[in-house]
Each structure stands twice: as structure tokens, then as C-alpha cells.
């Protein structure tokens, strides 16, 4: 595979692929994140037949993105990529409503991928009133490494796209990361990370330490986030479809399932 060193190369490949009609895709470029991947020698590309692949290398697996001419071409060209690149564990996210996503899932299943988990988007119209929440603070840069440590320890990297330390610091800098602190020095009982635009609030990560669950920490963090997004029109997040406790909590706040799903699939290439 070819190393991607600058964002401009990614842009060029996307334009070329679109012009060639490679419109079957799970690749939605994010300049801010991908500039970092290029800088860290973690982003690669390879053209196989009628599919342009992009690969993000991580310590124990690789995330695969594609732009292909058809579902059939994707399955065929994936076999070529896997054969050429030896051993490894590959993760693919397939995002969309069922009518768009299901043919892709069927194609990837036919070439050896298996489903790890399914996430579904929930949303609600932003309420007119937002409750304030006591004990919740904006995170500081001194919290960044501890938050990264908690994410690495309690989230599943293959399924939940754990952010880098640099991304965490960015959210802290724009005041999109709230924490509740524990009694011990430098301890954090919970945090919530979110993206905010004039139109929408998007929950990215919500965590409550196992030792304090059931004590209202999670609810106060959510209320603080909702208050921060009180001028938006809609509020969204993704939830694992088997996480019944979280779904029950979100429905309590008026969220309902939307058609968009993210099916995470894995492929282990062992030669």
C-alpha cells in the first residue's frame, strides 16, 4: 500500500474516484482527523480493480474505507487487497439506512467479514427548556491524559473509534468536554464529549466510572451537555442496539431511533 503523507493527496484521490463513478462508499473524509493520520504515518491507500481503498493503521487492527463502482466489485477487489497485504485484522464500518447498508453487509459477509456490533442513531428535537446541572465542570488540559486513559480502558477500540489525545485536547479547547470529579486527587467520576454546531448537538462519548454508577453522575453530565446545546435544533448520538440500559435512559429524555445504522464488521486474514 502507498503511504498518504498530505491531505491534498487524499482530496485528489477522492475527486478522481468520484469522477470515475466509484460511488459505493463508506468513506466520508474528515480533514482534521486525516491530517493527523497522514502526519503520523498511519494512513494508506491502494487501488484494486474498480475500488479505491483507504486504510488507517492502528496497533492491533486496521480500519478500511472504500470507494467502489459496485457492490460486486467491492467484494472482488477486497479479496485482492487482503491477499496482497498479508496477515492482519481489518475493521469496516457500514453506515446508512437498511436499504443502502444491507447490500454492502451481504457483500462483506460473503468474503469473510463477520459482524461485531450494530449501532443505531437516536435523535430528538431540542427541548425549549434545558435544566442546569450542579457539580459538572469544563475539563482542563490537565485532564486530557486521564480521559484518554479512561477511554482506552473502558471502550472497545474496534467498535467505538477511540479518539486521540490530540482530539481530546481539541474538545477541551472548544469547551465541548465536561467532567465530574471524584474525591481523590486527579480522579474523574465521569465525562461527556460532544460536537456542537448552530443546527445540532452530537454526543460523541459518555462515560461514568463503574464505581459511581447509579449515583446520578451520568444524568448530570447529560443535562449539562443538553444545556450547552439548548440553541440547536436537533440532538443526536449513536447507541449500541444491545445496550438496553442506555436506550431506556435516552428514551426517558425523548430520544427515538432513526433509520441510520452503523454495522461494524471484522475480518481476520491469517496466512
Each language-model region and where it sits:
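A conserved beta-strand-loop-helix scaffold within acyl/acetyltransferase catalytic domains
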Residues: 56-60, 163-184, 188-208
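Acyl-donor-binding surface of acyltransferase catalytic domains
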Residues: 68-133, 263-269
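Conserved acetyl-CoA-binding loop-helix of GNAT-fold acetyltransferases
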Residues: 71-84, 208, 214-227, 248, ...
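Short amphipathic alpha-helix that is part of the acyltransferase structural core
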Residues: 1-36, 119, 129-161
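N-terminal charged segments
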Residues: 1-80
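Cytosolic beta-strand hydrophobic patch enriched in CBS
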Residues: 44-46, 177-183, 237-238
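Conserved active-site alpha-helix within GNAT-family acetyltransferase domains
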Residues: 98-115, 219, 242-260
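Conserved hydrophobic beta-strand within the GNAT/NAT acetyltransferase core sheet
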Residues: 92-93, 203, 236-241
Amino acid at each position: 500500500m502507498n503511504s498518504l503523507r498530505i491531505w491534498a493527496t487524499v482530496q485528489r484521490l477522492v475527486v478522481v474516484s468520484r469522477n470515475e463513478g466509484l460511488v459505493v462508499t463508506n468513506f466520508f473524509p474528515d480533514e482534521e482527523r486525516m491530517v493527523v493520520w497522514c502526519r503520523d504515518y498511519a494512513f494508506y491507500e491502494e487501488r484494486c480493480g474498480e475500488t479505491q481503498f483507504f486504510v488507517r493503521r492502528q496497533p492491533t487492527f486496521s480500519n478500511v474505507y472504500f470507494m467502489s463502482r459496485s457492490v460486486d466489485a467491492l467484494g472482488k477487489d477486497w479479496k485482492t487487497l487482503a491477499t496482497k497485504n498479508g496477515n492482519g485484522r481489518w475493521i469496516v464500518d457500514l453506515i446508512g439506512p437498511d436499504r443502502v447498508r444491507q447490500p454492502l453487509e451481504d457483500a462483506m459477509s460473503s468474503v469473510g467479514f463477520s459482524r461485531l456490533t450494530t449501532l443505531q442513531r437516536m435523535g430528538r428535537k431540542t427541548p425549549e427548556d434545558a435544566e442546569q446541572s450542579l457539580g459538572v465542570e469544563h475539563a482542563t488540559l490537565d485532564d486530557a491524559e486521564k480521559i484518554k486513559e479512561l477511554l482506552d480502558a473502558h471502550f472497545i477500540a474496534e467498535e467505538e473509534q477511540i479518539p486521540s489525545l490530540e482530539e481530546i485536547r481539541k474538545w477541551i479547547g472548544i469547551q465541548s468536554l465536561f467532567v465530574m470529579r471524584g474525591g481523590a486527587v486527579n480522579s474523574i467520576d465521569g465525562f461527556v464529549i460532544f460536537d456542537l454546531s448552530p443546527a445540532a448537538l452530537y454526543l460523541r462519548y459518555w462515560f461514568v466510572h463503574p464505581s459511581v454508577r447509579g449515583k446520578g453522575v451520568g444524568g448530570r453530565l447529560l443535562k449539562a451537555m443538553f444545556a450547552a446545546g439548548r440553541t440547536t435544533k436537533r440532538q443526536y448520538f449513536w447507541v449500541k442496539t444491545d445496550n438496553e440500559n442506555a436506550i431506556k435512559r435516552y428514551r426517558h429524555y425523548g430520544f427515538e431511533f432513526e433509520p441510520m445504522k452503523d454495522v461494524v464488521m471484522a475480518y481476520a486474514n491469517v496466512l
